[in-house]
């Protein structure tokens, strides 16, 4: 499902991710002006690189924390249960122009943010005592929100991009316990894989 994103998207995504819903955001008009809520920082690309380096550096630890918390059969069947087999994940082309890479990064962050919201919601029910996992998921989502805001600032101020089509992953609310755990593991495996490529591209 696709929606249009504009300057108000960071705030809407904060609300969207907080509740972990899998439903799309309201549609923003195509002719929306390119405006950000706050002035952009002068060292924006450095901030984007630092945020990418941070999430890249913590992605593997989050992945391990996740599959360990799920218990058997996950830790001993990572290739089968946690392989990054997510077919609708937004693509990224590391050799594209900066504008193209930023647009693709925006789509990836929006997808990941909604996915982390779903994973966090599920884990609070399935593994209520896995507090370190909950904390790590929240910290990652917080960094991604800041990254999304910075990417939007850069797109708006330098390239006058007023909207970006974004898509969200599957909502897990109707799935059984095992499928919720498996999909979360696959998404975090994909996240770990993709964020490493993205971080090197900037």
Swiss-Prot record:
Q: Which PROSITE patterns match?
A: LIF_OSM (PS00590)
| Tagged with keyword Secreted | yes
SMART domains found in the cross-reference section: LIF_OSM
Which region is the signal sequence?
Answer: 1-22
Q: Which residues are glycosylated?
A: 31, 56, 85, 95, 118
Source domain of life is Eukaryota
Functional summary from the UniProt entry: LIF has the capacity to induce terminal differentiation in leukemic cells. Its activities include the induction of hematopoietic differentiation in normal and myeloid leukemia cells, the induction of neuronal cell differentiation, and the stimulation of acute-phase protein synthesis in hepatocytes.
Query: Can you name this protein?
Result: Leukemia inhibitory factor
Q: Which organism is it from?
A: Neovison vison (American mink)
Name the gene that codes for it.
LIF
């Amino acid at each position: 499902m696709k929606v249009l994103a504009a300057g108000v998207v960071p705030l809407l995504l904060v609300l969207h991710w907080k509740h972990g819903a899998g439903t799309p955001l309201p549609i923003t008009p195509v002719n929306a002006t390119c405006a950000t809520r706050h002035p952009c920082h002068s060292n924006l690309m450095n901030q984007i690189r630092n945020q990418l380096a941070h999430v890249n550096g913590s992605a593997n630890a989050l992945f391990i924390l996740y599959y360990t918390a799920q218990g058997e059969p996950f830790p001993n069947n990572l290739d089968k249960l946690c392989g990054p087999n997510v077919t609708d994940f937004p693509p990224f082309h590391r050799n594209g122009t900066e504008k193209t890479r930023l647009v693709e990064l925006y789509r990836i962050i929006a997808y990941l943010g909604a996915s982390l919201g779903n994973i966090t919601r599920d884990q609070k029910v399935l593994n209520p005592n896995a507090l370190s996992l909950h904390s790590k998921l929240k910290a990652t989502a917080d960094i991604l929100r800041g990254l999304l805001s910075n990417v939007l600032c850069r797109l708006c101020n330098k390239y006058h991009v007023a909207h970006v089509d974004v898509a969200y992953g599957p909502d897990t609310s109707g799935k059984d316990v095992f499928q919720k755990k498996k999909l979360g593991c696959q998404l975090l495996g994909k996240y770990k894989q993709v964020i490493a490529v993205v971080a090197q591209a900037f």
